[in-house]
């Protein structure tokens, strides 16, 4: 392992490193503190660590000695806090005053703001951050046997220098000797495989648990060396996954004919609301992939009313259509559209044309909500939206940066296939003409083959059409998120995802057409067309078609579809 990188998120934290054996970044799994190790988590993001902390009172001699600052630079002994899943589990029923569910936002602007207390001592944002990072580094040592001495940390693109200074002071006091910072949009660009040889404008849509942030940044090779991106415009709204959980819970409660008061001072009511919010999150994530899911947790007594068919109550089933309606009623889609349009309108020299935005990067688990990808696809085109690893992109990019292994040039990130039909069965045949990982531009005849027109109706063929599909697949045990032409989300690979591949037609409804003159007889099984495909510098798949019977060139490097 090498090239350590930390993506400190508001809700979840990812720790990644560069795997020399496989030549790629990987998230480090810390089973004792991560989300749901080896579970049936529908999103399969178990290696993320919840960014929560409960500060403990130092009771034992080892704990007190381990918290001595001069010693912490050299070794991390004892335990000063619970972090991640153990902290969540311990505070699920009754939250301790020493439990801090979020500290990143306060650390950025008010590091001395009290967020809790342990005994008579206040827990400031800075103390909470230090306790979390200390235990995270200690867990890495326990799990891998290695101390992290060289680390890249991702930071929000508009983070104040004070935020960087706070993190630097904390991490250096914990024994990190070489520390570098990398702007999150730049890390996401590297994680999604963007080459930064030339200047490009990138829009990062980051929707996490707490916020919806849309940033338009300009990336340059020089900025990569410094780990910085130039911010052209940014919009932030308090509209993330946590708000959606509340909307889902309210929707389900209305359907069941009950209410759980969010402002109640009664501990039992607050406990039930916390538990039901967690269930709302589970159901919400389940319908990312399923048509519907049942809400399994109900307050005492209500289950009997539902089973008895009490007036105003019914089983708590949430469908994907229900979730879309909840998002619409809550203003989620309107907020996203408004943020995108406002960012485009606030360029430093005036409005920025859509064509000048080269890439759209989706970051954060809430970008998987129904309707988000289709909204961006419709606005910018499928060929610009990179969305297959919203949880890992920032951490992967930072690990690549840490190991100095980022890709200097652009490459094609999906397989693209040319669709033909079997002469006997008429079934579609998908032949990959541009494999994933291809650098571009290529030669105009990067792929070439001689083809026989199908004559599917048994009559002379007068037309030929070029239909191209995107093929979503993954390698090894990893998983990717892929959207089909209807905008539905699929998980490819992983433990519970779809096996094999997902084929997405790109131009089936409007294929590139050519005419055969004279028509091709169905009895003639000799090749009639020589078809060549290539990729130009703008990622257009181009086609050259030669009529072998007449010797005429029917197409000469004609653009077919835009690739990603």
Language-model segments: which ranges?
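Conserved phosphate-binding catalytic cores of ATP/NTP-utilizing and phosphoryl-transfer enzymes
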Residues: 1, 179-207, 393-408
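Gly/Thr-rich phosphate-binding beta-strand-loop-beta motif of the actin/hexokinase/Hsp70
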Residues: 1-25, 195-229, 362, 525-548
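Short glycine-rich, Thr/Ser-proximal phosphate-binding strand/loop in the N-terminal lobe
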Residues: 17-54, 221-250, 551-564
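Phosphate-binding loop and its immediate beta->loop->alpha context
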Residues: 31-174, 246-293
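Phosphate/ATP-binding catalytic cores across multiple sugar-kinase/actin-like superfamilies
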Residues: 129-144, 185-196, 325-360, 367, ...
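Conserved phosphate-binding/catalytic loops in two-lobed NTP-binding clefts
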Residues: 175-183, 187, 373-397
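Acidic low-complexity intrinsically disordered segments
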Residues: 312-320, 409-564
């Amino acid at each position: 392992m090498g090239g350590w990188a930390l993506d400190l998120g508001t809700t979840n934290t990812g720790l990644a490193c560069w795997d020399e054996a496989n030549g790629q970044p990987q998230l480090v799994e810390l089973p004792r503190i991560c989300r749901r190790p080896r579970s049936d988590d529908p999103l399969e993001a178990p290696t993320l660590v919840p960014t929560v902390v409960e500060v403990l009172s130092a009771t034992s001699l080892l704990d007190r000695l381990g918290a001595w600052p001069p010693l912490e630079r050299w070794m991390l002994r004892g335990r000063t806090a619970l972090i991640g899943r153990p902290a969540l589990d311990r505070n699920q029923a009754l939250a301790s005053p020493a439990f801090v569910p979020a500290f990143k936002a306060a650390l950025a602007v008010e590091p001395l703001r009290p967020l809790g207390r342990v005994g008579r001592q206040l827990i400031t944002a800075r103390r909470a951050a230090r306790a979390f990072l200390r235990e995270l580094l200690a867990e890495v040592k326990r799990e891998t046997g290695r101390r992290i001495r060289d680390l890249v940390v991702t930071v929000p693109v508009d983070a104040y220098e004070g935020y960087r200074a706070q993190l630097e002071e904390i991490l250096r006091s914990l024994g990190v000797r070489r520390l570098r910072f990398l702007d999150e949009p730049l890390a996401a660009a590297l994680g999604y495989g963007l080459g930064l040889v030339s200047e490009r404008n990138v829009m990062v849509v980051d929707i996490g648990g707490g916020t919806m942030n849309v940033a338009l940044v300009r990336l340059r090779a020089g900025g990569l060396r410094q780990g910085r991106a130039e911010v052209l415009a940014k919009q932030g709204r308090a509209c993330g996954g946590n708000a959606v959980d509340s909307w889902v819970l309210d929707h389900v409660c209305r359907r069941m004919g009950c209410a759980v008061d969010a402002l109640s001072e009664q501990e039992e009511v607050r406990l039930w609301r916390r538990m039901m919010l967690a269930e709302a999150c589970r159901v919400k994530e389940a319908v990312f992939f399923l048509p519907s899911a049942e809400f399994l947790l109900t307050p005492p007594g209500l289950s009997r009313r539902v089973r008895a068919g009490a007036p105003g109550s019914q089983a708590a089933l949430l469908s994907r259509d229900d979730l879309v309606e909840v998002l619409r009623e809550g203003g989620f889609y309107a907020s996203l559209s408004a943020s995108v349009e406002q960012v485009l309108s606030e360029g430093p020299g005036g409005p920025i044309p859509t064509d000048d935005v080269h890439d759209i990067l989706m970051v954060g688990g809430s970008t998987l909500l129904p309707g988000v990808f289709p909204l961006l696809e419709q606005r910018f085109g499928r060929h610009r939206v990179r969305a297959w690893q919203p949880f890992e992109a920032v951490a992967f990019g930072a690990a690549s940066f840490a190991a100095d292994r980022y890709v200097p040039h652009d490459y094609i990130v999906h397989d693209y296939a040319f669709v033909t039909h079997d002469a006997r069965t008429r079934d579609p045949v998908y032949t990959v003409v541009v494999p994933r990982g291809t650098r571009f531009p290529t030669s105009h005849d990067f792929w070439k083959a001689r083809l026989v027109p199908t004559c599917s109706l048994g009559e002379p063929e007068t037309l030929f059409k070029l239909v191209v599909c995107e093929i979503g697949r993954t390698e090894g045990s990893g998983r990717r998120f892929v959207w089909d032409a209807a905008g539905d989300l699929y998980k490819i690979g992983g433990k519970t995802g779809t096996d094999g591949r997902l084929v997405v037609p790109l131009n089936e409804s409007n294929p590139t057409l050519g005419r055969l003159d004279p028509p091709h007889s169905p009895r003639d099984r000799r090749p009639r067309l020589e078809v060549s495909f290539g990729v130009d510098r703008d990622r257009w798949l181009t086609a050259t078609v030669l009529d072998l019977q007449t010797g005429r060139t029917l197409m000469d490097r004609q653009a077919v579809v835009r690739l990603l």
